[in-house]
Amino acid sequence: MSLVINDLLKSLHHLPLIFHMAYSDTKARYKRSMLGPLWLTLGAAVGVVGLGLVWSQLLHQERSELIPSLTIGLLLWQFISGCVIESTSTFVKQSQIIRNLQLPFFIHPIQLIVRQSITLAHNLIVLVVVLIIYPQNLGLVSILSIVGFAIVLINLLWISVMLSIIGARFRDVEQIVQALMPIIFFLTPVLYKAGHAGVNQAIIWLNPFTYFITLVRDPIFGNIPAVFVYQITIGMAIVGWGLTLIIFNRFAPRIAFWI
């Protein structure tokens, strides 16, 4: 485990570099475009408006109730799915850096999550506008969203590291994950709330992303997530990190040869 701990500590020591790389990557993607990174916000806004109008009719719900919930769910899903999908090719895309520079491996998954967090921060503008149009009774319970988001980040990091290693060894993993995520989207309470879907609730709660969405979204509307939601997500973090550390410790020396 010394290899894992050493790599992680070195990565944390390079946090300023990680933030700079994530910011530069985001900025470079929209260089010379008229709106720059605001295209991120515009894309999220179009998704919220379009899906909000359609699903409020299909689900026969008031827009004032559905759209705020949909906005948070959609922004979280874009963040989570972005981390999951891109992590399958993280080490492959950073192959030149990995081969030529002696940097810790954890830098690359952390950079991915930081970059996705920057995108999420841009998209929060959409949430602010929605909450102005459809005000919600925000209270002290809403602070639990921050705790929930921290738990989500802890889980996403081990998921990203795990998928980065597997994706470096098996290149087909990227296509498999990309094909599965649209299906998982409809099994995740993004467009609806977990208790409102007209499908088997057991299927929804077998989906780990359901817990991630619930942890962050429910407190914003004054609802404290059930105890089992915290128990399962914390348990996922403990078990997931344990498996990831074992796999990383065993296969990290081979990553440079795989890519």
From Swiss-Prot:
**Per the UniProt record, which residue ranges are transmembrane?**
35-55, 65-85, 112-134, 146-166, 179-199, 202-222, 228-248
Q: Give the UniProt subcellular location, in the record's own words.
A: Cell inner membrane
- Top-level taxonomic group: Bacteria
| Topological type in the membrane | Multi-pass membrane protein
| Keyword Transmembrane attributed | yes
Q: Which GO terms describe its molecular function?
A: ABC-type transporter activity
Q: Where is the ABC transmembrane type-2 domain?
A: 35-248
Q: What does this protein do?
A: May form an ATP-driven O-antigen export apparatus, in association with RfbE.
Give the record's family classification. Belongs to the ABC-2 integral membrane protein family.
Q: What is this protein called?
A: O-antigen export system permease protein RfbD
Organism annotation: Yersinia enterocolitica
Gene it is expressed from: rfbD
